[in-house]
Amino acid sequence: MLSYKKVLIVGRPNVGKSALFNRILDAKRSITESTYGVTRDLVEEVCKVGSFNFKLIDTGGFTILKDEISKIVVQKVLSSLEKVDLILLVLDVNEILLEDYEIIERLRKYSSKVILVLNKVDTKDKEFLAHKFHNLGFKRYFLVSALHRRGITKLRDFLKVEVGRVNIEEEVNIKVGIIGKPNSGKSTLINYLSGNEISIVSDQPGTTRDFIKTKLTRNGKVFEIIDTAGIRRRARVNEVVEYYSVNRALKVIDIVDIVFLLIDVEEELTSQDKKIAHYVTKKGKGIIIVFSKWDLLEESKGYFETLKGRVKFFFPVLNFAPIFRISVYKKIGLDSLFKEALKVKDQLELKTNTPDLNKMLNLWIKDYHLNISHKIKYITQVSTNPVKFILFANKIKNFPNSYYNYLVNNLRKIGYKNIPILVELREKIRDLK
């Protein structure tokens, strides 16, 4: 795996860390609402400046609050200080608070790699405010406005020289999104896979808000794994931040090859799980149903087979999807899960040529004994990943579902067994472009 130097952004809540993170990246990755404590996880991204790369890490706000999540966030920040090459300490140029002094004291032992970034210097008139920060003892500093992009180019150029490495692109063979309800075990899984606690693990639902990326090699292939905030029913999304997280999770589905739909084995499958599955299949993405926390279950003989039967009965939209059980703590099922993901990816990349398809189509039509007025004329595969076919018929109005399903089931038998198949019906061959 490629190794980049790491730059950690730290500071109390609402000094503009995530806005600065996005500006340095020149992309909108972290959620940046003006809500106290919005970023909770370590959000990592490779930053590209010209032909140089480094890893940029956004952190949760350093706070003196004593609730469980705040304490976990602070501990995560402190445990990261030793591991990084550079620390950007972000302060609000307009004020310095008790929490600022608290983190400054924690950074004293790392002062050689601390860069002071005074944010919210929105106009040139505010630059004079910087003088009150000189006595903090940090030799290197930058004046920026993340909101107005002031000073960002200068800071990016500095980081390029200080920690940048020549850009060598690493091929990603497969992208996997970890999707599911809050507290279904997503963060525990990605922390195990990455070897770092980059996503907060807690028994409070909704502790991951940003999406978390990590790369790993399994079976000789490079996986990019993306963990997301748990998807809730839209009716329950009553915070701006949660709204952004739900939409970001849906956007993650758009960019990955395969989704691991995590379901807590102690909970019943829900209509929300079904909605997620519908969205995934509509997009033509691979999907593997993963029952997590299997170690918590007192399993009776044959229970897993019963569970699989229930999924296929109550969720027929997923009747093609592989179903696995895992336990991160007992290391159950993880190797098999990744092997299956590679098999699904191979199916997504399968392309069957048009002459062979139409030879098989003629056989399928002959074997279909019901007498119907709808006649299939031609079939062609127009894309892979997502796999999509176009069927041309003499008419498509009131096309029988049973006939449609019969054709799809036959397509599955030629190599598309465990993936969604998109099939579009058209009436005229000349419509194909």
UniProtKB/Swiss-Prot annotation:
InterPro entries linked to this entry: G_ENGA, GTP-bd, GTPase_Der, KH_dom-like, KH_dom-like_a/b, P-loop_NTPase, Small_GTP-bd
GO biological process: ribosome biogenesis
Residue ranges occupied by any KH-like domain in the UniProt entry: 349-429
The organism's place on the tree of life at top rank: Bacteria
Residues the record lists as binding GTP 2: 180-187, 227-231, 292-295
Positions in coiled-coil regions: none
Keyword check for Repeat: yes
Stated role: GTPase that plays an essential role in the late steps of ribosome biogenesis.
Known partners and oligomeric status: Associates with the 50S ribosomal subunit.
Protein name, UniProt field: GTPase Der
Organism the protein comes from: Borrelia garinii subsp. bavariensis (strain ATCC BAA-2496 / DSM 23469 / PBi)
Gene giving rise to this polypeptide: der
